[in-house]
Amino acid sequence: MVSSTSELITQPVNREEVVPSRKRIKLPAWLEVVKPRLIPLLLATTVGGMALSEEWPLPSPRLACTLGGGALAAAAAGALNCLWEQDLDKRMKRTSNRALPSGRLSQSSVFIGAVACTLVSSALLVSGVNCLAAGLTLLGLCSYVLLYTAFLKPRTSQNIVFGGVAGAIPPLVGASAAAGHIGLGGWWLFSLVMVWTPAHFWALAILLKEDYRSVGIPMLPTVSGPFVTAKAISVYGYLTVFLSFLGCFVLPEGGLLYGILLLPYNSRLLQLVSRLRDNPEDLDRAKGLFRWSILYMFGVCFLLVISRLQVSIVFNDQLIALIKDFSTGFS
């Protein structure tokens, strides 16, 4: 029993095992370097930020400029991250075949591409949205590359707690694109993404802890071990569930329906968090939590949009009226 547990802990896990699509889809070098798999969730939280505004839905041109500018900025951030970490990637077997370490792309071409994406992104957002959305997008790019990648990641096991601000900025971009200011709803979704990020990322870090250890990156599982990490994941998981329900009160309309539809998402998240806490050394449990956490955030943003549909608003109002009638009958 001890030996099997030891194998479970020490056997390296590839990202291909965690994200099955990586096995099936081999991206060209120029696309691989911009990390396209990360972009859809960033755009989803951007749309979630929009849905929290009174001005939802947005005109199609402004929506397209916001999402296009956000996608280009995320691509630039991914490319600059690859540039910064190419020496680390070269030292890890799992990442040594990436575009930059393997020599399939040159440093200069990646840098020029990142600058071009940044300039086009800024132009789209300034001309088609507003300066606040453009400034926040640039802030997100800089915070990911400079704050997280360059400063926090190699220095502290709490890197993702503070560095998670980069991934939490898209809701602010969405809110500002819709209304010209951020508003309470935008700040709520920003906070939700901030507390969701550690639980999401540490589940992945448990799977890849040997990789991080081999290059001296102080991720929480490599510094404190899986038991401490699982407890921390549990804390952030419960915080995520608590904060997610506050969306009922910040949605301009449809809050009750959103809260009801959110129940199965939160139940599943808590179930997976509890399973990992009970056995932090089970990599399948960490893998399951990581995968569900991605679907969870997509689901929250989907529910925010669904709750703002006219049919949902009518149904939400009927639910409220039914509850009032029911409570009146007992008074």
UniProtKB/Swiss-Prot annotation:
<feature type="transmembrane region" description="Helical">
    <location>
        <begin position="241"/>
        <end position="261"/>
    </location>
</feature>
<keyword id="KW-0472">Membrane</keyword>
<feature type="transmembrane region" description="Helical">
    <location>
        <begin position="160"/>
        <end position="180"/>
    </location>
</feature>
<feature type="transmembrane region" description="Helical">
    <location>
        <begin position="132"/>
        <end position="152"/>
    </location>
</feature>
<comment type="pathway">
    <text>Porphyrin-containing compound metabolism; heme O biosynthesis; heme O from protoheme: step 1/1.</text>
</comment>
<keyword id="KW-0997">Cell inner membrane</keyword>
<comment type="similarity">
    <text>Belongs to the UbiA prenyltransferase family. Protoheme IX farnesyltransferase subfamily.</text>
</comment>
<protein>
    <recommendedName>
        <fullName>Protoheme IX farnesyltransferase</fullName>
        <ecNumber>2.5.1.141</ecNumber>
    </recommendedName>
</protein>
<keyword id="KW-0350">Heme biosynthesis</keyword>
<dbReference type="InterPro" id="IPR030470">
    <property type="entry name" value="UbiA_prenylTrfase_CS"/>
</dbReference>
<feature type="transmembrane region" description="Helical">
    <location>
        <begin position="109"/>
        <end position="129"/>
    </location>
</feature>
<keyword id="KW-1133">Transmembrane helix</keyword>
<dbReference type="GO" id="GO:0008495">
    <property type="term" value="F:protoheme IX farnesyltransferase activity"/>
</dbReference>
<dbReference type="InterPro" id="IPR044878">
    <property type="entry name" value="UbiA_sf"/>
</dbReference>
<dbReference type="GO" id="GO:0005886">
    <property type="term" value="C:plasma membrane"/>
</dbReference>
<feature type="transmembrane region" description="Helical">
    <location>
        <begin position="294"/>
        <end position="314"/>
    </location>
</feature>
<dbReference type="InterPro" id="IPR006369">
    <property type="entry name" value="Protohaem_IX_farnesylTrfase"/>
</dbReference>
<dbReference type="InterPro" id="IPR000537">
    <property type="entry name" value="UbiA_prenyltransferase"/>
</dbReference>
<feature type="transmembrane region" description="Helical">
    <location>
        <begin position="215"/>
        <end position="235"/>
    </location>
</feature>
<feature type="transmembrane region" description="Helical">
    <location>
        <begin position="63"/>
        <end position="83"/>
    </location>
</feature>
<keyword id="KW-0812">Transmembrane</keyword>
<dbReference type="Pfam" id="PF01040">
    <property type="entry name" value="UbiA"/>
</dbReference>
<keyword id="KW-1003">Cell membrane</keyword>
<dbReference type="GO" id="GO:0048034">
    <property type="term" value="P:heme O biosynthetic process"/>
</dbReference>
<keyword id="KW-0808">Transferase</keyword>
<feature type="transmembrane region" description="Helical">
    <location>
        <begin position="188"/>
        <end position="208"/>
    </location>
</feature>
<comment type="function">
    <text>Converts heme B (protoheme IX) to heme O by substitution of the vinyl group on carbon 2 of heme B porphyrin ring with a hydroxyethyl farnesyl side group.</text>
</comment>
